[in-house]
Amino acid sequence: MTLHTAELKQGLAQLALELTEPQVELLQRYLALLVKWNQTYNLTAIRQEERMVSYHLLDSLSLVPHLAGGTRMLDVGSGGGMPGIPTAIARPDLQVALLDSNHKKTTFLRQVVLELGLPNVQVVTDRVEAYQPEQKFDRITSRAFSELSEFVKLTRHLMADDGQYVAMKGVYPYEEIALLPQGVAVSEVLPVTVPGLDAERHLVRMVLQ
C-alpha cells in the first residue's frame, strides 16, 4: 500500500502539529492496520485508503491542539480508534482510554496497541454507563457517539473535577446545545478546518457546573 506520506505531512503542517518521523510512521502503520482489518471487521464505511487520511487521521488529529492541560483522556465509543489512537500517537504524554462495547472493535484496538507499542493507551470493552475506572478523566471526547445531552448524561460519573468535554461534531450543533441539561455549560464552540475534508467540523467544549 502507499503510505500517503506527503498528504499526511502536509495535513500535519496545516494543523500546526509538529510530529517526529517515528510518530508519522506510527500513524501510517495504524492506517495500514485499519485498511487491513476493515475488510472483515467493518470498522469504517470509508474504504478508500486516501480518504482515510483526511477523514480519520487528520480529522482525529484536529482535536490535539485543543487538549492542552489534559493528562487523562477518555474516547467514548472509540470504534476503530478515532480520535483516540491518532491522539495518543501525537501526545505520548497523555494517558488515553479507548472505550467501546463492541468486542470486535476492541479486539482490533488491542491489536493496534500491541503492534504499535502504545504504552499510554488502554482499551476497555464495556458500556459507557457501566464503566467504573479507578481514576476519572480530565478530558472526555467522542466522535459521532451520540447527541450532546446523551453524551453528558452517560459520562458524568467519569469526569474528574475541573475536567472538560471536547466533543467532535460536524455542523454547528445549535439544537443539541439547546437541549443540554442544567448543570452543563458550553464554554466554547470552535470551528475546525480539516485538511482534505470538504465538510464542516466543530469542537464543543463543555464543563460541569
UniProtKB/Swiss-Prot annotation:
Record-level GO cellular component terms: cytosol
Enzyme Commission numbers on file: 2.1.1.170
Sections of the chain in a coiled coil: none
Gene Ontology molecular function terms on file: rRNA (guanine-N7-)-methyltransferase activity
Family annotation (InterPro entries): rRNA_ssu_MeTfrase_G (IPR003682), SAM-dependent_MTases_sf (IPR029063)
Reactions catalysed: guanosine(527) in 16S rRNA + S-adenosyl-L-methionine = N(7)-methylguanosine(527) in 16S rRNA + S-adenosyl-L-homocysteine
Annotated keywords: Cytoplasm, Methyltransferase, rRNA processing, S-adenosyl-L-methionine, Transferase
Subcellular location: Cytoplasm
Domain of life: Bacteria
Binding site for S-adenosyl-L-methionine: 77, 82, 128-129, 143
Any Pfam family: GidB
UniProt main location, coarse: cytoplasm
Enzyme class name: transferase
Function: Specifically methylates the N7 position of guanine in position 527 of 16S rRNA.
Family: Belongs to the methyltransferase superfamily. RNA methyltransferase RsmG family.
Protein name (Swiss-Prot/TrEMBL): Ribosomal RNA small subunit methyltransferase G
